[in-house]
């Protein structure tokens, strides 16, 4: 199966991409998948891509459009879903209400 050049070029130009880079050796895949689900549910249709990227060495990072918005070591632990949603919202749609989270 091939993707037409139009579709491929449009998808590569899309912004609003999240990458959750997690330590597979530490068994953090489920935590990463849960956070991805939370982001996709909250920003339904607004996020174009959420990627889970396995790694090693205790890594847990969340990237938004190439910008590091959460790092486990720097931020002293894992993000709560609420905090991660607020950071994403504040960077992409500062005026967007998050309902009961705000």
Model-derived features: positions:
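Domain-level signature for proteins that mediate thiol-based redox and metal-cofactor handling
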Residues: 1-102
């Amino acid at each position: 199966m091939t993707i037409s050049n139009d579709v491929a070029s449009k998808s590569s130009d899309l912004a609003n991409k999240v990458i959750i880079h997690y330590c597979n050796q530490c068994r953090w895949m489920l935590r990463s998948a849960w956070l991805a689900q939370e982001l996709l549910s909250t920003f339904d249709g607004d996020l174009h891509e959420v990627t889970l990227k396995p790694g090693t060495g205790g890594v847990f990072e969340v990237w938004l459009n190439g910008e590091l918005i959460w790092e486990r070591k720097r931020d002293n632990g894992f993000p709560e879903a609420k905090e991660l949603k607020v950071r994403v919202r504040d960077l992409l749609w500062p005026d967007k209400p998050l309902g009961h989270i705000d």
